Swiss-Prot record:
Record's GO cellular component terms: cytosol
Organism: Pseudomonas fluorescens (strain ATCC BAA-477 / NRRL B-23932 / Pf-5)
Protein name: Bifunctional purine biosynthesis protein PurH
Domain comment in the entry: The IMP cyclohydrolase activity resides in the N-terminal region.
Residues annotated as domain MGS-like: 6-151
EC number(s) stated in the UniProt entry for this protein: 2.1.2.3, 3.5.4.10
GO biological process: 'de novo' IMP biosynthetic process
Superkingdom of this protein's organism: Bacteria
The reaction(s) this protein catalyses: (6R)-10-formyltetrahydrofolate + 5-amino-1-(5-phospho-beta-D-ribosyl)imidazole-4-carboxamide = 5-formamido-1-(5-phospho-D-ribosyl)imidazole-4-carboxamide + (6S)-5,6,7,8-tetrahydrofolate; IMP + H2O = 5-formamido-1-(5-phospho-D-ribosyl)imidazole-4-carboxamide
Pfam families: AICARFT_IMPCHas, MGS
SUPFAM superfamilies listed in its UniProt record: Cytidine deaminase-like, Methylglyoxal synthase-like
């Protein structure tokens, strides 16, 4: 059994990196510790130009770099030095003049950055597939009992600290080994994804006609947290995040206080945050079981998120109990005070939190308070995944949204400016409500939300019941539907409760009947041409 605490001293290191962040300082410290350094190409030149003593790999192996750098480190004196088992292979290493290499610091050609450049063609992508680097990484990782492999610049400081204490323990080398295999797995997966989208029949080998979906789907996530249980107590669970999230979200959030996030907390907080990101003016979204139960935009700048919260809460005070609250502005003291004095809340998330607000929420020690950072107005394209038994559904994320200019008026009466504002507000909310989704809204406040019903007209009835229960007046509100109305009964029901304007995608075989129902009731209706199913 390997001793977990015995430290391995480092006498010889091989350094060859594409990303040179921190490498010069790392090499200088290694040199100061008496470590002999082998290096290649641009890394060797950087060290040499900055006074770090190093031996070029070509001089050590006696074999010059060739084929425009394609062959540099693929040599027995390199891989024998990395793979050689101390105490087992010593004689054969000595016979062939192979010196042990105790530490390998390598990161790989920037394949991802290359393929993301506009106009990248297949030959360019191929030249940025690293061969020698992954080979050294895997060799060192395989022989982690005797060799330390460092692929992340973030590990340089910790490695140096350990070397100054006498060397790296087996536990540390094992952790570095795991990071190395994760690194090469992600790299190979990225290459496979890319190559799987290239049109093989393209004579020019251009990648402009690439398929959107690769032949095999490879993606890597990093474990951020193990959870007490999953969606239900009998299920185990963990939260994994992307190495480089495309934009601000639940995966980038910092927890400032409160109990550990649960599986359901993460899912619900994601739903709340993604919804509130849809709004430009100060807004609040309250979510329960992944559905918005109250959403509002502050009617004036002075009201801020405090006023938005009051209006969102008023939509459904019962469902807000134990909910998730998200804001698109910094959480201030007044809003924090209003929340903690009024209701039980699981999670509060905002781009940032004032010190005064933190102090107020601290009085409720169990409340999970998160700051996620400010997001860009531009939504990043990304993939959505849905696991099915034996497979995975993959689609582009629904980042589609419309403006007033995109609306097609299909009724005799056109909506007023106020109705248009409310229609777009309700449409943004409906996008985040489980289908079939119906949202009633007035003055950019949700009046009633009907979610997740098998019948669209029943969702509309539930939205009206919710509004009545909350003491809110449906008459004079607008209605949003995430998909088309298959029959006119949805509009007849809307007329009955006093809806004045409707927004929906359109596209039903009976659109003419639905439009006629709206005209009969004097309801203005617009089509978006875009559906927002959410399952």
């Amino acid at each position: 059994m390997t001793d977990q605490t015995t430290r391995l001293p480092i006498r010889r290191a091989l350094i060859s990196v594409s990303d040179k962040t921190g490498i010069l300082e790392f090499a200088k410290e290694l040199e100061a510790l008496g470590v002999e350094i082998l290096s290649t190409g641009g890394t060797f030149k950087l060290l040499q130009d900055n006074g770090v003593s190093a031996v070029e790999v070509a001089d050590y192996t006696g074999f010059a770099e060739m084929m425009d750098g394609r062959v540099k480190t693929l040599h027995p004196k390199i891989h024998g030095g990395i793979l050689g088992r101390r105490g087992i292979d010593d004689a054969i290493m000595n016979e062939h003049g192979i010196k042990p290499i105790d530490l390998v610091a390598v990161n790989l050609y920037p394949f991802e950055a290359t393929i993301n450049k506009p106009g990248c063609d297949l030959p360019t992508a191929i030249e940025n597939i690293d061969i020698g680097g992954p080979t050294m990484v895997r060799s060192a990782a395989k022989n982690h009992k005797d060799v330390a492999i460092v692929v992340n610049a973030s590990d340089y400081a910790g490695v140096l600290e350990s070397l100054k204490a006498g060397g790296l323990t087996y536990a540390q080398r094992f952790d570095l080994m795991l990071k190395a295999f994760e690194h090469t797995a992600a790299y190979d997966g990225m290459i496979a994804n890319y190559m799987g989208t290239v049109n093989q029949a393209a004579e020019t080998l251009s990648t402009s006609g690439r398929s959107e979906f690769p032949r095999t789907f490879n993606s890597q996530f990093i474990k951020a947290q193990e959870m007490r249980y999953g969606e239900n107590p009998h299920q185990s669970a963990a939260f994994y995040v992307e190495a480089k999230p495309a934009e601000v979200g639940i995966a980038t959030a910092t927890q400032l206080q409160g109990k550990e996030l649960s599986y359901n907390n993460v899912a619900d907080t994601d739903a709340a945050l993604e919804c509130v990101k849809s709004f430009v003016k100060p807004a609040c979204v309250i979510v329960k079981h992944a559905n918005p139960c109250g959403v509002a935009v502050s009617p004036d700048a002075e009201g801020g998120i405090r006023q938005a919260y009051e209006l969102a809460y008023a939509t459904d005070t019962e469902s807000a109990f134990g909910g998730i609250i998200a804001f698109n502005r910094e959480l201030d003291a007044a809003t924090a005070k209003a929340i903690v004095e009024r209701q039980f809340v699981e999670v509060i998330i905002a781009p940032s939190v004032s010190e005064e607000a933190r102090a107020i929420v601290a009085a409720k020690a169990n409340v999970r308070l998160l700051a996620c950072g400010q997001w860009s107005a531009e939504r990043a394209a990304a993939w959505d995944y849905k696991r099915v038994n034996g497979g995975l559904l993959v689609q582009s994320r629904d980042i589609g949204m419309i403006s007033a200019d995109d609306l097609k008026v299909v009724t005799k009466r056109a909506p007023t400016e106020q109705e248009i504002n409310d229609l777009i507000f309700a449409w943004k909310v409906a996008k985040y409500v489980k289908s079939n989704a119906i949202v009633y809204a007035k003055n950019r406040q949700t009046i009633g939300v009907g979610a997740g019903q098998m019948s669209r007209v029943n969702s509309a009835r539930i939205a009206a019941i919710k509004a009545e229960h909350a003491g809110l007046q449906v008459a004079g509100s607008v209605m949003a539907s995430d998909a088309f109305f298959p029959f006119r009964d949805g509009l007849d029901n809307a007329a009955k409760v006093g809806i004045t304007a409707v927004i929906q995608p359109g596209g039903s075989m009976r659109d003419n009947e639905v439009i006629a129902a709206a005209d009969e009731a004097g309801i203005a209706m617009v089509f978006t041409g875009m559906r927002h199913f959410r399952h």
